[in-house]
A protein has these predicted regions:
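Short, surface-exposed coil-to-beta transition loops
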Residues: 142-146, 170-172
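Primarily the HKD phosphodiesterase
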Residues: 65-132
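Signature of lipid phosphatidyltransferase scaffolds
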Residues: 151, 155-202
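N-terminal, intrinsically disordered, polar/charged segments of Gram-positive cell-envelope systems
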Residues: 37-50
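Short, flexible loop segments at the rims of nucleotide/cofactor-binding pockets, characterized by
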Residues: 49-55, 85-87, 134-136
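Secretory targeting signatures
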Residues: 1-39
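Short acidic active-site motifs
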Residues: 61
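Solvent-exposed loop/turn segments at secondary-structure junctions
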Residues: 79-83, 114-118, 139-143, 155-156, ...
Length: 202
């Protein structure tokens, strides 16, 4: 039986075996990525790598990278819903992470749409009271509907997830995580353009 196996391997050829092995790795990785359960943390993407984060997979990955942030975190979000009644609300946890990072000296800045100020003023109050710089976009006539997080000038989360409990745990939402300093620079420039023309929330 062993001799038969060796003969088969010889017949297939090393190149074909390597190709099959690599194909197996790719298929295995794809399956693991796309059937991962809610909140599953994927390993860091290679430079230029892209991860698809559907539904609640976004939250686990975002917290993974926020926990490792040491330089900067820039957030642009249409709606951020802080709810002081529920400490374990996933949005509350994200905001606490931002506050903790800011107090450690990380450059944390947040831009939200007026809808956050109107519907969820506790969000603004919590961030401002803890010193985190927050701005609204340049005019009430402008809607900031983007949902972006840029971490350490390298990791970009961009997609449909607002920071609400529903978006993070229930809704069908999609976001891409891109590991690219080049893209991060472009998106940071976009963030800075909104930030520089933004309004204080008070």
């Amino acid at each position: 039986l062993i001799e038969m196996g060796v003969s088969v391997l010889r017949g297939v050829g090393l190149g074909a075996l390597v190709a099959v092995f690599i194909a197996g790795l790719v298929v295995g990785y794809y399956v693991a990525l796309h059937v991962a359960g809610p909140g599953v943390q994927q390993p860091a993407a290679p430079e230029g790598g892209v991860f698809f984060l559907p539904d609640s997979a976004y939250y686990g990955n975002l917290t993974y990278y926020l926990d490792r942030a040491n330089k900067s975190v820039y957030v642009v979000m249409y709606v951020v819903k802080y709810d002081p009644r529920y400490p374990d609300d996933p949005v509350n946890k994200l905001l606490r992470k931002l506050v903790d990072l800011y107090k450690k000296g990380v450059d944390v800045r947040v831009v939200v749409d007026d809808q956050t100020l109107i519907s969820y003023p506790d969000t603004i109050n919590y961030l401002v009271q803890n010193g985190v710089p927050v701005k609204l976009d340049e005019s009430k006539s402008v809607t900031t509907h983007a949902k972006i997080v840029i971490i350490d000038g390298k990791y970009v989360f961009i997609g449909s997830h607002n920071w609400t409990e529903s978006a993070l745990t229930k809704n069908h939402e999609t976001t891409l995580l891109v590991d690219s300093t080049k893209l991060a620079e472009e998106v940071t420039n976009y963030f800075e353009s909104i930030w520089s023309s933004g309004r204080p929330p008070a």
